[in-house]
Design a protein with these regions (language model features):
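Short hydrophobic alpha-helices and adjacent helix-cap/hinge residues
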Residues: 2-10, 18-130
Length: 130
């Protein structure tokens, strides 16, 4: 009898919990860090950033997207790691909720720069070539 009552209560409360979670998510503005492998002058970077913003908006997610540029064509890997650690430090200061990387260089450098941030936040990868 107690088990049946528990199941009825659980089934009855589950939609309320899920619905409350959706309300909370809709009200919150998420801080998103979008790391691009190249510099801001690369022709497609603006479209990538716009695509991230549009996709989140269409999904009903309010987000403030901050873009960081690694400029991987210019720097050596050691210098990229220094830049990535700075990007991670700024992300910490802005209370970033999620990191999105675009292309191999951004993801690889993020995971190997020595900063702990990518191991504490969800990381979404896109545009992996190799």
């Amino acid at each position: 009898m107690k088990r049946r009552l528990f199941l009825v209560m659980l089934i009855g409360l589950f939609p309320c919990i899920v619905f409350a979670g959706h309300l909370y998510a809709a009200e919150r503005t998420y801080n998103v860090l979008f790391i691009q492998s190249y510099n801001h002058r690369t022709p497609w970077n603006d479209r990538l950033t716009e695509g991230v913003r549009d996709g989140l908006s269409r999904g009903g997610i309010k987000a403030k997207v901050t873009t960081g540029y690694l400029d991987a064509d210019y720097w050596t890997f050691a210098s990229e790691c220094v830049i990535m650690r700075r990007i991670c430090e700024r992300a910490r200061q802005k209370n970033t909720d999620i990191i999105i990387t675009s292309s191999d260089e951004a993801f690889y450098t993020l995971m190997h720069c020595g900063d702990s941030l990518p191991y504490k936040l969800p990381v979404v990868i896109s545009g992996i070539k190799y």
